Structures are given as C-alpha cells and as structure tokens.
Amino acid sequence: MLLEAIGSGARRVRGLPPRDPRQAKFVTGASLRWMWRNRAFSPWYLMRFWRLFWLRVLHPDVVTEGMVFIGRRVELYARTGYARLILGRWVHVGAENRLRAHEGTLRVGDKAVFGRDNTINCYLDVEIGAATIMADWVYVCDFDHVYDDIHVPIKDQGIVKSPVRIGPDCWVGTKVTVLRGSTIGHGCVLAAHAVVRGDVPPMSVVGGVPGRVLKDRVEVYEAKAATRAALEDIARKTARAAASSGG
C-alpha cells in the first residue's frame, strides 16, 4: 500500500494521467502469502523487490501486471505521453537489458525471460509472447532509418516503422537480430547470429543471414515417433522383467 500511495502522490505532483488499471498491487494478502510460502526473503529476492519498488515510483508509465524480477543496471523506458511499456507477470529481466518504448507500445508476455545485454527498441508496436526466452545480446527493433536522399544527412531523413511480433514459447538465440515487419510464430527457435525479417511460420527453426527456415519442429518430432515408441517399449519390457525376477 505504501508503494501505491507514493506512486499516486508522484503522479499528482507531475500532473500525469491516472494510474493504469493494469498496474498490479503488490502489497496484498496473496503476495505476502506467496513470499512466505516460497521463503522469498533472501538477499536475491529483497534486492529485486527494492528495484521493482523504485521502478514503480520513478517510472509510472511502465506497467507491471504482476511480479517482475529485474537485474542489475536494467533500463526500462517509456516516453511519457507517447509510449507504453507493459511487462506481464513473472517476467525475468537479466542484467544490463534495455527495453525502450520511445513511441507506441512494447508488450512482454507472462513468464518471458531475458538473459543479459539485450536491446529492444520500439517506435510503433513490439510484442514478445509469453514464456519466450531471449538469450544474450539480442537486438529487436520495429523501425529503420530512411537514407534515400544523398544530399540530406541520414539522421534528418526520419524513420519508417512496421510492427514486430514474436510469438509465445519461442527461443531467441545469442546475438539474433529481429528487424521491423517481422512476425515470428509460436514455438520458433531463432539460431544464434540469425538476422530475421518477415514472416516465420510457427514451430520453425531459423538460422543464417538473412534468416531462413532450416527445419520444422513438428516434422522432426513426428519423424522420431517410431524411435520414441521403441524406447518406451524397451523400458516397459525391462521393468516387467525386473518385476518378474524380483518376485
């Protein structure tokens, strides 16, 4: 309750809009019971509670829909009046990540995990699905700089934007780059160092520069069905033989 009171007071002083209804309340009976049940009193937990407290006080435009675990030197930025950064429940953000919503909306689904040193830049719309894993040094952006006019500095020619969607249950490997206009289906694996742009079907494994589909996870799983069945049969027979000899 102290957190909500301080946050509300800060919003009144700054003249900001009312509190977003999606903002979770952390000091509740349920949250205290969770802390007790999980023995969440270690220095690791206490430091993350402290970081979350100051995030809510100093950055009210960052919406946290539930408990969020924040590592060291993390940058969570949403430009007031222009952008919104929404973090789902149980999101883990490792050390030195940078999630920047300059304009538009940057949404992170429940239980997404960020390794370290990842950068997400949003100027229109970026969505990272629930339970998606981002490794280290991943870069995601939904814009490009315009460079058509050779007589005008590139920095003065503006940008072009297209939304980025990374579906749930994806694994984005080390040093992957996801460019504007990309839609990554659920359950995809983006191999290390891949540069991805465009549509990627669900359950695909993508690698290379530019990124291309290397295999279909469903096809691989079904192709190994006979092997799995044979191994299960061996395990059953072994267990049956052991039970018979023991009797």
Where are these regions (language model features)?
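Domain-scale signature associated with acetyltransferase and cell-envelope carbohydrate enzymes
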Residues: 1-141, 167-169, 202, 211-215, ...
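Short coil-to-beta microelement around the adenine-binding A-loop and adjacent beta1/P-loop entry
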Residues: 61, 163-164, 182
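Beta-rich strand-turn-strand
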Residues: 121-125, 174-189, 194-198
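Proline-centered turn/helix-capping motifs that create local helix->coil transitions or kinks
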Residues: 140-149
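A short acidic, glycine-rich active-site loop
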Residues: 153-164
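A conserved catalytic-core signature of glycosyltransferases
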Residues: 161, 167, 173
